[in-house]
């Protein structure tokens, strides 16, 4: 693991209450799995605080990375951290920064839904069928529904959809709503609070 950032960027990150983190794989050198960035937001300015070259996407790796970032930022205590929906990273954040409010990134949520559209062979329908496309977009719009109304809104949307949306709704239900079994909802993979 390699972590790098300037004194100024790490200082900026240390003084930022809101952090944003993401990894990318295409630009990582061959001996690493991903390039991970941690950004800070302060006074309307968004700056990359540090970069990390990580060997894999395992929880222990994320924990070690975040502990090092915390040390490099003089034990910074961000109040919120926005991330993609990577379970291992979310778990690591709750270990290293338990006080931080973890927020899921809407862009990554939409990207995840669209990847599922593609993997189920529905990309062509998404491109040509405006009603289908709108219904899929309405699934992602559930992110804007008040927490107490998410399940009801999901159920209403499910009743509204009449076609291939079921494949996407099933995926969304298991991961983000909580699958209905024997009259009770299981916990989703990702909490509604994300």
Annotate each language-model stretch with its function.
Residues 3, 7, 51-52, 67, ...:
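Short alpha-helical patches at protein termini and domain edges
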Residues 21-23, 51, 82-85:
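Short His-Asn-centered micro-motif
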Residues 26-29, 54-57, 82, 160:
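Conserved, non-catalytic sequence blocks in retroelement Pol enzymes and Pol-derived host proteins
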Residues 1-35, 41:
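Structured nucleic-acid-interacting core domains from mobile-element enzymes and related host factors
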Residues 72-194:
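Extended amphipathic alpha-helical interaction segments
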Residues 35-38, 47-56:
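A short, conserved beta-strand element enriched in hydrophobic/aromatic residues
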Residues 10-11, 27-29, 45-48, 58-61, ...:
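Eukaryotic short linear interaction motifs
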Residues 30, 51-75:
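Active-site beta-loop-alpha junctions of metal-dependent nucleic acid enzymes
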